Amino acid sequence: MLILACRYHPQVHVVVIGAGVFGTWTARWLRRRGASVTLVDQYGPGNSLASSGDESRVTRAAHGPDDHYPRWQRHSLAQWCELDPTLFVPTGVLWFASREDGFEAGSAVTLERLGMANERLDADEIARRWPQVSPDGFTWALYEPDAGALMARRGVATAARAFADEGGDVRIGLAQVNGETVTVSGERVHADAVVFAAGPWLPKLLGAVPALEISVPQQEIIYFATPPGDDGFDAGQIPTWVDYDGSFYGIPSIERRGFKMAPDWPGPIVDPDRQERRLSDERVEFARGYLRRHFPAMADQPVSEGRVCQYELTADTHFIIDRHPTMADAWIVGGGSGHGYKHGPAVGEYVSALVLGDQAAAATLAPPDDRFALRPRVTSLGMRTAGAAPAPRVDA
């Protein structure tokens, strides 16, 4: 077992497998703590097949009654902005609510307790501030003025370049595991520690690990062209928004790419290497039905772009950060569950402290429970931007 008391570790070599947001930030933090680090990915950082391969991701402090993730979100956002301030687009996030006992109300209480900015807006105020929005069916909304969107693919690529500039080694290679042996492109890995951070490829890579319960459902993201001559759906004019109970979310047009939205419920289970990444007519029409009700000026706009990616869902939507149960000095990091991207820097910082045995540093970021452990989990969709609804609420 690798246990090192010193805070700088030039003698330690760590191999991180997977250059998505968790793996790249873990590699960067290991390097910043002095380790020699090799970051391996079969397609390379920022590739379009990764769960972090789309253009943007929501960053928000609201996580219902949970107060650990809000702290991680703020801690991570500071690091994203330090890496490159243009990675954060401060749109604010608007949470639509139709009841007083839901995710939004729990989030408001938590944000108040943590001293994080939030506003309660009634339906009339929503329509006054953003006339593009029809609050039909909503009685109020929670608004996070300090939240917004992160540039996803560009963020991972930028973090990987920073890691390389800091002396890290980035390699393209196919990792495989056979018992206790790890190979990359056929060559055996020799390292003091290995971190498996392969996102939706974890079930393929480590399928024999007990309690590694990660499903890989398809997720479709639709970009609608904004109306000609109308900038009301651009970032700065309308916030990022979430309908938790309705299982929809959206991000305003950034870089003129279109008004992004997604029916946020799991699609079919897919192989991330083999799935055909084409939008389905069904989900596009579901999305149009939602637009017709709540963003009527967008309802008949054409699809400008589409992304088909995948989630890596754990049953309870909490991440997995734990030791490999049988492989010495190996760690499993994954299960982003549709809300992991924003937390990438905090995950990397926390994992690097665990791997290098810096218990004091790890304790400052540790959750108050065993949520990240390899363990049986009870099904819940709680931490994603989708509630319990199995399909979207749409009145076409």
For each of these PLM feature ranges, what is it?
Residues E55-R129, T139, S247:
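Dinucleotide-binding Rossmann-like beta1-alpha1 core, especially the glycine-rich loop
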Residues P296-A396:
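C-terminal catalytic lobe of FAD-dependent flavoproteins
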Residues R28-R32, L87-V89, P200-T326, V394:
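Active-site substrate-recognition segment that forms the wall
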Residues P145-G179, D192:
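Helical element adjacent to the flavin cofactor pocket in flavoenzyme catalytic cores
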Residues R32-S51:
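Glycine-rich FAD pyrophosphate-binding loop
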Residues V14-T38:
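N-terminal Rossmann-like FAD-binding beta1-loop-alpha1 element of flavoenzymes
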Residues F96-F103, Y143-R161, R278-E282:
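Short beta-strand to alpha-helix junction loop
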Residues I17, V189-P200:
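Short hydrophobic core segments
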